[in-house]
Swiss-Prot record:
GO molecular function: ribosomal large subunit binding; ubiquitin protein ligase activity; zinc ion binding
Lineage summary: Eukaryota, Metazoa, Chordata, Craniata, Vertebrata
Cellular component terms (Gene Ontology): cytosol; cytosolic ribosome; RQC complex
Annotated organism of origin: Homo sapiens
PROSITE patterns the UniProt entry points to: ZF_RING_2
PTM info: Autoubiquitinated.
Family: Belongs to the LTN1 family.
Pathway assigned in UniProt: Protein modification; protein ubiquitination
Highest taxon of source: Eukaryota
Leading EC class: transferase
Protein name: E3 ubiquitin-protein ligase listerin
Length: 1766
């Protein structure tokens, strides 16, 4: 290729990748050419001949393997890596015979690629090798010798993953037992390869200098050398002993090479490390050979002792020790005092240079191997050695690292013990070790807190213990005596430095702490040693352990080597002090020292009140609490105890110095108020108690102290100290369980609760410690038992519960947060800690109260959020404890039983608002989730059963639900009623309290959802009942026509908590639930029937599941209310056949009823209602059947006319009669819709006369509209009138033929007039009585059908109205009174709160608007020139209304920036304001369009002055959507333009509400469209004067959505125009928004192009002309300007503008004669007119023609008259 991002090189048609090239070559030729690197036999593995000469060999290698092997010879790392991975995969996947063919070629490749520079390649090579081994197994044996050297090197690779991969391959080939044999088999070849690498190879021989960079060559060489050295070591370790002799010669030759010994000084640390490892291995495995090379080994190793590289150091020191062990005369070849020791001293003085953990463990073995000859004089040598060693502790690195300092300290004590052991009896050395080393070292440590850790003191204790043990057991008296002297001397010196530290008046804190820690360790060395979590390697001296069998020693890896004469092991803790008793050699001096220090300390406390010495004394007494020490502390002071103490206490004081000290000193210190931290004083108390003889004495002392002497904080501290320590707890157990402390704590609880509630003073410092004390005694347990007696625990909990119970009843002003908070803390700790203790009865009462506080809203409890959170955590911890008690059950648990009853009462009897219910459900959620963890599987089911109401309780709650839900089903005809079950009370009900049925169903549904996670079994169909009741609640909410906000919130809460039918139905039995619903529907009807319809409609249940329940149609008869409602709800989902079956059951029943039966449910009313329900879905298409029923109804009128409520007073009508009338009217409406057969004249008369009579009844009974059935009667009456109006409005010539003669004229002249003469006054009356009632309210239900009917009113009927006169004083108008009355009556209704009224009024006024401008036209002359800018107002009624609306919209939209879209909630108050405003503007614009151009100018000036149009435009850009596209256009054909609110006409429907959310946006777009179309100049003026941001928003929106529509309409008007121009043709191009006019005069063509801008009509229209013909420049410009101005600023159309322009041109050329020379009006070249006139004949000629005539004829005469021209 031509490189990255370049074109392929010309002619380079084959792939550039080497792998792909090889693959292509193999495909073309069938073989791969031979290449260097593979041998033809086992003896010669270096060369592979060309394949053409060795087909028989190459045929053994698979072609895919050939390809991969070829890739492996490439230099590219990626190619090699992928090839090796591919090779490994192929080895795994191919059969063994195929893979075996690769073996002859593998060794050469492996040997080369295993040394590759890239570590990934090396790792992949070893991984592939392992796969090859696993496949070929023993077949690899012939090739081992060629491989083994490099294989061993690979196992020592410096890249660990590669080394591990090589070891894995080696282990896959050879089990551990066979590995030595394999190495022995190849030992000569291995040695040869490794020696060559070490002696012969160089960077340039290993890598090609021509192609490999120097840095890479050197790196590879260093790695190869390192691996070779390590491989030699591995060879030595793996080889059996009997094979070593055969390699001596080869190793001799290696060791004879100076190059080998130079590796010890190599600059690369990895090489030096590998070198020293090899030296160690050689010393161990071939010691004789190393002895021979002593002169080279010794300097090479010992003189490198100061090498501080972390890589080299471990191997170096290992080599040092092996050298000292193997070569006895090594010191002959180096100068120890001048060369080795100074280097060693420097290293250890510097703390090992950061390698103390590596170097210092080797120091003891090192000095143990030093011959005496080179350490003389011993005193100086050991003194310098130890001094240097201690100096290492002073380095920064050692101070900051605990591991480093531990290593130094450990080495110091090991060496000190060794030197002491070796030189015992030599006083100078003994003195030096104690006086100059050990004591100064301890003194330095006591001063430095950084060194005061357990390791140092443990080592000291261990050293002393070993000396003491040896002195006790040593048989040699001299040695024992020497050791005793050393110990005596040590204790004397130690006593001196300790006394000196404590005797300082201002004792150093660190020193005092150090002394106390030291004494503790010396007192209890074993226990302190146990505190050390990590076991450290210790040195065990030869005389302390049995000699190990040296013959079994074997060379292992460098970690944990065993070397002759010394051994690293883990020493057990003090063997001789296992009993815990101190040696007499330590006990007496230690006690003497303690007494001295105690005496010094108490003196400082008494004299100077030294806090520091008192703390030290506390620590001292903790370890040394004896009568002797307490006597020392009392000194010579006499007993001064108060005589009022009981006799028993007085005796104890006399007998026991510790008790005397307690009363005499300690109590006074404890009661000092200024002391904040007194925990150490309590420790002294415990030390004194230890000196009592028995528990009874201790209890007596503590009881006495509890009564009077001890404060609450002291008691708290005593108990706190007892909890974590079993020793201390054992001392005070009788006192804790006793009556004295128990009663005091109960009194404390009582005091705290009362004081906190009454005083209302929450002082944390005063109460917190006491509350903590209560919490402690309730929550702490020892061996699953309370600290104090159970009876006192019970009494304390009872007191806390009583306090909480009071809090629950307090008002907000009385509540006390602090008491609740403290009780929460106490209770939480109590519940959380009582894991092994059973809850007490009182604690369950407390738990219930906590739960109740959490399950109630903040408005009731008046508790802040933080306390509610605390309460929740507290009661949850209690419930969690309760359910995990093994023997807990529902019956035994007071809490579970009472909480269930309380929950049941809360939802049934209590008044809950949304917030309260949400809090309750949340608490129940927490409770039940905790109960789920119980092992009792029935617990949850029983709990839910306890909350579940019985059937009568459910029924009572259902009946208590308000009945307003019936409004919608009645209006929509889904249910029918013939009795008055309620009267609608429109007064505001409680707007917060939720009905109990809703709360109960929500609670139980939530409980069921949680319970069934664990497959809890509910009895007695409780699950189905709960789901049914939830569905009842949800359906009740859904059916409310205008649900209050709190009910909407209730439904939202259920959704958030996933309490939905979909979530519940998967848990229960659907068939069982459906059976339950059908049973209830058949029994009760109403909502139960609607629930079934809802489930079917939402596809929650299928029709197949429902069918079995209505299969027997006859079972629903005789009709009851339940059966009727069930059938009505099922009707929408029944098939035609099923509906016919039900209808067949009803039709016979409609015949022959008495008046009473006609109105009953099982009579005419019920059966007609079922028939109507079936007819609603147009499933009955039998015209004869419909006619038959109509005739039956007509017969009813004849037989029982008084049943028909014609023009009567409904207050006297019964609900049954109202019900049957409603069903008759409904049937007639449905009959009109679905009956296609013609009606007889008498039938038409019955329908229309009945309709008008029912409307009269409606009109006469407006006062009874509050009665639901009357309201429903009014609705269906108006519906029938509306349906009739729609029927006659939609009649065509075809349908008129089927109607009786004169029916249309009768309708128009009588019935239609009668309808509107009744409904128009009703509209005025109803809207006048109720100003602020929304259309969704039941009271305004009849507005929809009434208003829809009024939209059919004709203009003539409007103008002939009989409304009372309504005129406004000072209202300027040219309209006649009847018209002004109509405007003044209807226009204000555009502000009415109901949308149907607004739309109906709009439709009526819209019909009047075109008639109004003519009245202003008649009075146009009165608007003369007396005004500078004459203006005329549109109809005053509309403008006054507009003024009100502008103020309302300013409140709604004024604060919203222009361009920010406002979403108006449908049917809200703001919705009605905006709707009325926009409808008003549509009327004004309609009025404006109907006016003449003169009037439009006057109206425009008025709108400009009032700035109403500007306000409108600002509001429109807050209401129009950013994307005014119809949602359904997304799925339409993409090539078509999308439908927008500007392309689609707005249908202002009263009944259709599905598009309500888009109503305002669409209407706003419609108004904007009209404004741009009818008032473009005014919009353009506003746009140009607006600020830049608004300017851009308007421009962008108009260009994108409106301009194209208006441009298309303008262009289309040109294309469809019938106007014809003589001599001018007009063409329009819609795509380019251009209109081209072509004006033709003779042979001359003039083109005029008018182009509309992209933001039309905001931008200027461009007028272009190609040629100027026969007109002066200025005149031509004037014409163009006139046309442009007319189109842009005068709201003119394009056709009108073109007519204007043509008129100008025609006038210019009108009457112009032809030039008598060229016989044309316009000159053919310069387009001029004939202007030069002859003075004689007056004929005019073109100047150019005349000039040509003069020049060609050589005469200056007129061409026509031949007279001289000039």
């Amino acid at each position: 290729m031509g490189g990255k991002n370049k074109q392929r090189t010309k002619g380079n048609l084959r792939p550039s990748n080497s792998g792909r090239a090889a693959e292509l070559l193999a495909k073309e030729q069938g073989t791969v050419p031979g290449f260097i690197g593979f041998g033809t036999s086992q003896s010669d593995l270096g060369y592979v001949p060309a394949i053409q000469g060795a087909e028989e060999i190459d045929s053994l290698v698979d072609s895919d393997f050939r390809m991969v092997l070829r890739k492996l010879s490439k230099k590219d790392v990626t190619t090699k890596l992928k090839a090796m991975q591919e090779f490994g995969t192929m080895c795994t996947e191919r059969d063994t015979e195929t893979v075996k063919g690769v073996l002859p070629y593998w060794p050469r490749i492996f040997c080369k690629i295993s040394l590759d520079h890239d570590r990934r390649v090396r790792e992949a090579t070893q991984q592939a090798f392992e796969k090859l081994i696993l496949k070929v197994k023993k077949q690899l044996a012939p090739y081992l010798k060629s491989l083994m050297g490099y294989w061993l090197m690979a196992q020592c690779d410096t890249y660990t993953p590669a080394a591990f991969a090589a070891k894995d391959a080696f282990e896959a080939a050879f089990p551990p037992s066979k590995q030595p044999e394999a190495i022995a088999f190849c030992k000569d070849e291995i040695t040869s390869v490794l020696q060559d690498h070490l002696i012969k190879e160089t960077p340039d021989t290993l890598s090609d200098p021509q192609t490999v960079p120097e840095e890479e060559r050197e790196a590879k060489f260093y790695r190869v050398v390192t691996c070779s050295l390590l491989a030699l070591k591995r060879l030595l370790c793996l080889l059996p002993d009997n094979e070593l002799d055969s390699l001596e010669e080869k190793f001799k030759s290696l060791l004879s090479q100076n190059k080998f010994w130079k590796y010890g000084k190599h600059s690369v640390p990895q090489i030096r490390s590998a070198y020293f490892e090899l030296v160690s291995a050689l010393c161990q495995r071939i010691p004789q050979l190393m002895k021979e090379e002593a002169s080279k080994v010794s300097p090479s190793v010992l003189l490198s002792i100061d090498d501080s590289d972390p890589i080299v150091c471990p191997a170096l020191w290992e080599a040092v020790l092996y050298t000292l062990t193997t070569i006895e005369d090594c010191w002959l070849h180096v100068n120890a005092k001048k060369s080795v020791f100074p280097k060693l001293s420097t290293v250890i003085r510097e703390g090992g240079r950061g390698l103390a953990t590596v170097i210092y463990p080797y120091l003891l073995p090192f000095i143990s191997k030093l011959p005496q000859s080179i350490t003389n004089p011993k005193l100086d040598f050991f003194k310098n050695f130890l001094t240097s060693l201690v100096a290492g502790l002073s380095t920064e690195r050692t101070k900051t690292s605990s591991l480093e300092s531990s290593a130094v300290i450990s080495a110091f004590f090991e060496c000190l013990r060794f030197i002491m052991q070796q030189n015992l009896g030599e006083e100078e050395i003994e003195q030096m070790l104690v006086n100059d080393q050990l004591i100064p070292f301890i003194d330095a440590v006591l001063k430095d807190p950084g060194l005061q850790h357990g390791q140092l003191f443990n080592h000291l204790a261990e050293t002393l213990s070993s000396w003491e043990a040896k002195a006790d057991t040593e048989k040699d008296e001299k040695t024992a005596h020497n050791l005793e002297n050393v110990l005596i001397h040590f204790w004397e010196r130690l006593s001196e430095i300790c006394v000196a530290k404590i005797s300082e008046p201002e004792a150093d804190v660190e020193s005092v702490l150090g002394v106390s820690n030291l004494l503790q360790v010396l007192q209890k060395p074993k226990s302190s040693l146990k505190s050390s979590k990590k076991k450290n390697g210790k040195v065990r001296f030869a005389d302390e352990i049995l000699e190990s069998n040296k013959e079994n020693e074997k060379c292992v890896s460098s970690e944990g080597e065993k070397i002759e004469g010394w051994e690293l092991t883990t020493e057990p803790s003090l063997t001789h002090n296992s009993s815990g008793l101190l040696s007499p050699l330590r006990k007496k001096p230690l006690e003497d020292l303690v007494c001295k220090l105690a005496d010094i300390s108490i003196n400082y406390v008494n004299e100077r009140k030294s806090e520091q010495h008192l703390r030290f004394l506390s620590t001292l007494l903790d370890s040394f609490s004896s009568s002797r020490v307490f006597k020392m502390l009392l000194g010579d002071e006499k007993q001064s105890i108060v005589q009022a103490k009981p006799l028993e206490i007085a005796k104890l004081v006399q007998k026991n110095p510790a008790v005397q000290f307690l009363y005499q000193k300690l109590i006074g210190w404890l009661n000092e108020d200024q002391r904040k931290d007194f925990g150490f004083l309590v420790d002294i108390l415990y030390s004194a108690l230890r000196c009592c003889d028995n528990d009874m004495e201790r209890k007596k002392v503590l009881d006495d102290l509890t009564k009077v002497d001890l404060k609450w904080n002291s008691l708290l501290k005593i108990i706190e100290k007892a909890c974590p320590s079993s020793d201390k707890h054992a001392l005070v157990t009788p006192w804790l369980k006793g009556d004295i402390l128990g009663e005091k704590l109960v009194n404390l609880a009582d005091c705290l609760c009362n004081e906190d509630l009454e005083s209302r003073v929450s002082s944390e410092s005063h109460f917190s410690e006491r509350w903590t004390l209560l919490s402690l005694v309730l929550s702490q347990h020892v061996k699953n038992d309370y600290l104090i007696g159970d009876v006192y625990v019970e009494r304390i909990i009872v007191r806390l519960h009583e306090t909480l119970f009071k809090t629950k009843k307090l008002s907000e002003a009385e509540s006390s947060d602090s008491s609740v908070s403290f009780i929460c803390d106490v209770a939480y700790n109590y519940f959380s800690s009582a894991k092994g203790c059973l809850l007490m009865p009182s604690s369950e009462d407390l738990l219930l109260t906590l739960f109740q506080l959490c399950a109630q809203s903040k408005e009731k409890t008046h508790l802040p959020d933080f306390l509610i959170c605390k309460l929740k955590n507290t009661w949850l911890s209690g419930v969690n404890l309760l359910v995990h008690q093994t023997d807990s059950s529902y019956k035994e648990s007071t809490f579970l039983h009472l909480s269930a009853l309380w929950l049941k009462n809360q939802v049934q009897a209590s008044s809950l608002d949304i917030n309260s219910l949400q809090v309750l459900l949340s608490a129940v959620d927490d409770l039940l989730n905790t109960l789920l963890e119980s092992e009792d599987s029935y617990l949850m089911g029983v709990y839910i059963g306890s909350v579940m109401p019985n059937d009568s309780e459910w029924e009572k709650m259902r009946q208590s639900l308000p009945m307003q839900w019936l409004h919608r089903p009645l209006l929509e005809g889904r249910l029918s009623l013939n009795y008055e079950c309620f009267k609608t009370d429109f007064k505001e009900q409680d707007i917060k309290t939720l009905p109990s049925h809703l709360c109960t169903s929500a609670l139980l549904s939530k409980m069921v959802l949680i319970a069934l996670r664990k497959e809890t079994v509910l009895e007695n169909n409780e699950l189905e009942k709960i789901i049914a009741e939830l569905l009842y609640s949800l359906q009740w909410c859904e059916e409310l026509d205008n649900p209050p906000i709190f009910l909407i919130g209730f439904c939202e809460i259920l959704q958030k908590m996933n309490i939905t039918y979909d979530n519940l139905r998967v848990l229960g039995n659907t068939s069982g639930l459906l059976q339950l619903l059908f049973n209830r529907s058949r029994e009760h009807g109403t909502l139960w029937s609607l629930i079934i319809a809802k489930l079917i409609l939402s596809r929650s249940i299928s029709s197949d599941e429902v069918k079995p329940h209505y299969k027997r149609k006859e079972s629903f008869f005789p009709l009851t209310e339940g059966n009727l409602h069930t059938i009505q709800s099922l009707c929408p989902f029944l098939s035609k056949e099923e509906k016919k079956e039900f209808s067949a059951q009803c039709i016979p029943a409609l015949l022959g009823w008495t008046k009473k039966d006609l109105c009953s449910t099982n009579g005419g009313f019920g059966h007609l209602a079922i028939f109507n329900s079936c007819l609603q879905t147009k499933s009955i298409d039998d015209g004869e059947l419909l006619h038959g029923i109509l005739k039956i109804i007509i017969s009813w009128k004849k037989e029982h006319e008084d049943i028909f409520l014609f023009s009567c007073n409904l207050s006297e009508a019964s609900p049954e009669v109202l019900g049957v009338n409603i069903e008759i009217i409904r049937f007639l409406s449905l009959f009109l819709k679905y009956c296609s057969s013609p009606l007889a004249e008498s039938e038409w008369d019955f329908i229309m006369c009945s309709m008008l009579a029912w409307l009269e009844t409606t009109s006469e009974n407006q006062a009874l509209y509050s009665i639901p059935l009357v309201q429903l009667f009014a609705c269906v009456s108006c519906d029938l009138a509306c349906d009739l109006s729609a029927f006659f409005d939609s009649t065509t010539l075809d349908t008129i033929g089927n109607l009786p003669v004169n029916l249309i004229s009768e309708w128009k002249e009588f019935f239609s007039q009668g309808i509107h003469s009744l409904l128009l006054p009703i509209l005025v009356t109803v809207t006048g009585e109720n100003k602020d009632v929304s259309e969704t309210s039941f009271q305004n239900a009849m507005l929809k059908p009434m208003c829809e009917t009024l939209t059919y009113i004709s203009k003539e009927q409007l103008l002939s109205h009989k409304l009372p006169a309504r005129l406004v004083a000072d209202q300027k108008t040219n309209l006649p009174e009847y018209l002004q009355t109509l405007l003044n009556t209807l226009a204000p209704l555009l502000l009415f709160r109901a949308r149907p009224v607004q739309i109906a009024v709009y439709h009526m006024l819209y019909k009047l608007m075109p008639e109004l401008p003519q009245y202003d036209q008649d009075n146009l002359k009165s608007y003369g020139d007396e005004e500078e800018e004459p203006a005329l107002s549109p109809p005053a009624a509309l403008m006054s209304l507009l003024s009100i609306q502008e103020d309302l919209l300013e409140n709604v939209l004024g604060c919203i920036p222009v361009g920010q879209i406002v979403t108006i909630k449908p049917l809200s108050e703001d919705f009605c304001y905006v709707l009325g405003y926009l409808l008003t503007w549509k009327l004004i614009l309609t009025f404006f369009k109907a006016a003449s151009s003169q009037l439009r100018a006057l109206y425009s000036m008025y709108l400009r002055k009032t700035k109403s149009l500007n306000k409108l435009l600002y509001h429109l850009f807050r209401l129009m959507p950013e994307n005014p596209t119809y949602a359904e256009t997304a799925v339409e054909v993409p090539n078509k333009d999308p439908k927008t609110f500007f392309t689609e006409e707005l249908q202002l429907s009263i009944r259709e509400t599905t598009m309500l959310p888009y109503h305002i946006p669409h209407l706003a777009c419609s108004v904007y469209h009209m404004t741009l179309k009818d008032l473009p100049a005014m919009v353009r003026l506003w746009w140009n004067s607006s600020e830049k941001r608004v300017f851009n928003i308007v421009d962008r929106f108009t260009s994108k959505y409106v301009s194209s529509v208006l441009s298309f309409q303008e262009i289309s008007s040109v294309q469809t125009s019938t106007q014809l121009f003589n001599g001018m043709t007009v063409k329009a191009r819609a795509t380019t928004r251009e209109v081209m006019a072509t004006y033709t005069i003779e042979d001359i063509v003039i083109e005029l192009i008018i182009q509309l801008p992209s933001n039309y009509p905001l931008g200027s229209i461009i007028v272009e002309s190609g040629k100027r013909v026969g007109v002066a420049v200025q005149q031509w410009r004037n014409w163009m300007l006139q046309l442009s101005t007319y189109l842009t600023h005068q709201n003119g159309s394009i056709m009108e503008g073109l007519a204007l322009w043509k008129n100008n041109v025609d006038k210019r050329f009108e009457g112009v004669e032809d030039c008598m020379i060229c016989f044309s009006v316009i000159h053919g070249f310069n387009y001029s007119l004939p202007k030069k006139a002859c003075r004689t004949c007056k004929k005019k000629f073109h100047s150019a023609c005349l000039y040509k005539w003069f020049t060609s004829s050589n005469k200056s005469t007129c061409p026509l008259c031949r007279e001289t021209f000039f």
